[in-house]
Each structure stands twice: as C-alpha cells, then as structure tokens.
Amino acid sequence: MKKKMSFRHALSVHFRAAKALHGVSRRFFPAATLYTVVGAILPYVTVFFSAQILKELALLRRPDVLRNWVIAGVLCTGLCAVAKAVLFQRTETMLDDLYGRKETLFCRKFFSMDYADVDKQETRDLRAQIAQNENWSSFGLMQVPEIYERTLKSLIGILSGIALTVTLFTSPVPESAGKLTALNNPLFILILAGVMILISILAGRLEEKATSYWSCVAEEATLSNRVFSFFGFIGEHKGRGADIRMYNQQNLVTFYWNGDSAFGATGKIGKLALGPIGGYSALGTGVVALITGFVYVFTCLKAWGGAFDVGSVTQYVGAATAMADSIFKLTAQLGNLKTNAGYLDATFRFLDIPNSMYQGSLTTEKRSDRQYEVEFRNVSFRYPGRVDWALKNVSMKFKVGKRLAIVGENGSGKTTFIKLLCRLYDPQEGEILLNGIDIRKYNYQDYMQIFSVVFQDFQLLSQPLGENVAGSAKYDRARATKALMDAGFGDRLAAMPKGLDTMLYKDFAEDGVEVSGGEAQKIAIARALYKDAPFIILDEPTAALDPIAEAEIYEKFNAISGDRTAIYISHRLSSCRFCDEIAVFSDGQVIQQGTHQALLAQETGKYAELWHAQAQYYTKQTPDAAEN
C-alpha cells in the first residue's frame, strides 16, 4: 500500500467494487443517491429562501410577497428536511443490510475456490487482513458507499453553489462607487475565483496527507485489533471458561491486553493521531476558514459599492462558503479514494484467486450395481509450500464392495490419502483411476457424488437436525430418520420433542439443543448414510465415542454399508477386525497390506506392533502377570 497509486487505477478499482456491491444489493445505491441529493441541496434551499426574505425586508417590505416567501421557504425546507429524515432511515437500514450481504462475496469465493487454495495459510492470512482492515479503519469494500455519498454530495454542493453565486461575480458595481468599480474587472474576479479554488484544493490535500498516514500503521493496527478481538472477548467463550478458572489464565490475558499499546497515546498510532494526522487535518480546516474571509470581504465590498442588496449578501456568503467546503471535501475524498484503493487491491487479490484444478467433462457412470473401482498408481503428493512428501509412491486398488481399513501413526499420510481420493487435491506424481480412467477427466461435481465422507474435523451447522443430515432445506424425512437410527442416534432423536426439526445449538434459537461430541459424530455419520453414495469413508469417525459405542457403530456399518465400498481410518485397531483388508501407512508410504490375521502373523511388522501396544490396555491380566 506504500506504492504510488495512480488516480486512474484508484477510480477503476472503486468502480469494480461498487459494481460488486450493487450485485449483492441492488437497492442501496439508488436509495443512497436520492438521500445524498436531498441532503446536499437542503442547505442551499435554506440559504436561498433566507436571502429572499431578507431582501424583501430590506427593500420593498410588501406583506403579501413576504408572506409568500415565508410560506414557500417553510414548505420547501420542511419537505426537504422530512424527505431527508425518511431517506436517511431507509439508507441506513440498507447500509446495515449491505454489510451482511457483502460477506456473501467472500463466502461464494470460498465455496467456489479450489480446496487446495482454501487450505493455504496465505489465503487465510489474506482474508484475515481484509477483515482486520475493515474492522480497525473501515477501509475496503464498505468504504466505497461512504466515498460515493461524500463525493456525490460534494459535486452537488459545488453545482448548487455555482448556481447561487454566479450573480455575485456578474453583478456590476455602479460607476458612482469610485475605486470599488475595480471589482468589476474580469481579471480580478478570475484571480479571486482561482485563489478560492486553490485554497480549497490545498485544504483537501492536507486532509489527504492526514489520511495517508493510516496506511503506514496498517500492520500495527491490524495486530492490535487482533489482540483486542481475541483477548477482549475470550471471557465470553463458553469453551474456555473452565480452563481460564482452573489455570488463572485471566492473568495471562491481562498481561497481553495491557502490553498492547498501539492505540494508546504512547503507541505509534496514538502518536501519529496526536501529531501529523491531527495537525494536517486541523491545518486543512483552518485553511478553509480563509475562503470564508475572502468571500466576506469580496461580497461586502460589492454590496457597499451598490452591486446588490443585503439579502443577496446572505445568499452569496452562505452559498460561496458552502461551495468552498464542498470543493475541500471533494479534494479530500479524491485522496481517500487513492488510499482506499490499496485496501481494495487486497480484497480483489482474494476474490481473483484463480481455480487452477483441471475440470474434466466426463460423467461418472450411474451404476445400480455400484461397480466402481479406484486405483492409486505410483501416487506421490506434498502440500503446497512444503518440501517433504506427505505420500510417496503409493499404489493401491480398492476391491469393490469390500471394507478397507487404513491405519498408521499420526502424520503417516492417512488423511492425505483420503483427500486425494476425494480429489480435494491433485497429486504431483502418479495418477488415480476410476474404472481405469484418470479421475481428473471426470466432471468434478459428478465425481464428488460417488463419495460419502465423515472427516475427523467435520462440522455441523446451527440449523435443524434433519437439514444437517440431508444437507438441504427440503429432504426425505423418513430417509433422514432411518439414517439417524442406523448411526445409533435413535434414542436421542426419540427424546427430542421437535424430532428432526430440533435446532442444533443456540446460535439462532433459544430452544436450540447442545449435542455432545459423540452425538455430533453420530449425526455426521447419519449425514454420510443419507447421501447413499457408492463409496463411504470414515476418517476417525468414532474418536469421541466410547469403545462399546464404537464397536456397535462398526458392527452396524457392516450391515448398513451393504454393497458399498467402505474405507475406515481409525487409531483404534479393534475396528480393523470388521474389515476385509488393512493398509498400514508409515511416513507417507504403504508398508503393509493384508487381512487382520495375516498382518498379525507378521510379528515384526508395524501392524502387529501397533496392535499389541493397544491390546495391553484391554487384555485382562492375572495378579501375578500384573506384578511381573
């Protein structure tokens, strides 16, 4: 943001931002335009009618004319004031709505973005930076409506001022005024108008200079705002309450809270606000006052010379001063436009992240017999930005309709294997085949439909239970109920008065139901069953369940999965006994593959090592054995 910003680029990026905001809220800008126009002309309406009333009082004093001017002034001013108030409420309501709708731009981008980019830390950091910019300084997308309203108001103010002051310059001083006739010289008038404009521009430049300092402290402000956002509300987080009390973490929170002084008087931001930012801003305001002085002197001299009456003095002074203020604000907004453009660049860097994953066009064959065969052929993969391989030369073929267990220590590549299978990532080496065809050649959405997955870090929404299971607002209630029953959630479902309509969690409903980790896992499993895909994948799906509940789930799954191909990932090797084949991962490679009994027979193998390490905690020992 410290790079020189061209006005053309700044204008272009703001037009794009306005177009994006108009796309999510088509009523805001028309409403804001109407409100701004009415608000901008209201001061000039007051000035105009005040001048006419004073003129009549000072000159002819005709009661009927005076009455008409008063009535017209009251009516016009009142109508404009009422219209402004009504339009203000409407515009503010739409602005609040726009704040929420603006987030859909980022949501839609996340939804359509390649998962590989969603998973990148750089992407998360960029999105956080955009949010922090908006939180601490309001720069970014939501600065665009403000710039639009202020710029439009300034332009209307300038045009209105010109309309009301044009006769200030064209009304001649009578020849009888002597030396004051010099005020009629076009060159003098041109110089005066030029000086007023230059002073207004200078004031705007000073305000622009003050605003430019904010981008210099963006990094400090962002960090400080993160500290505030995290530590300022940590006590309200119900999941942290117990730890805070058990370990006196409030002392640690206070330490970091008090240690951050970026916004304090002694911090960098505070020093700038009290120093150059405040200084330049005050200087700009002071410079504008010079214009008022010039206007008063010029207007009074012409009135003294007899160019116009006292009523016109009121009109010219008020209109010229307001016009100069509009020029000042317009110049300041043009500077703000350039400052905000840097923040908008960050926004569009995020929104313009390209989808680089190849999108095929083949459709996956809809087979009633579920005869899909998947093969990993010499597949190697490493995460973006990493030099170490997460998977190395993995080759494996899934037997259709069988149960495959994938085991291994943490970091061995199990979850990465599943992400590649679901094509959340593409491998750097090798290929993955579906019925003999590279999966990259299939239509992506079509390919995804053949998998039902329960990830270990699954998420449920704060929505009705049935909608969580179906992933849709419209769904088959009988099918959703059966899926929950098959997943072992039947007893809990029966205890819910609203059944499938029970709202999960209390984010949006006071009568929302909190579910335990184990219950949430059962709902996630039910969601996978409801999809009824040919492949069902469970990545640590029972980590929050006790061993008995886990065994029940796996026993049911053998019956539930039917002719589906099922893949299990679990640290509890007891689940492997339900599977037809087991693949053992270590350091990104498949080092063993076979049945439970066959792998146990390999006493020096990794599987036997893991099995016996867990079995000792479940094997009943005699007192003598325990002592030994």
Language-model segments: which ranges?
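C-terminal portion of ABC ATPase nucleotide-binding domains
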Residues: K498-G499, E555, G562, R572-N628
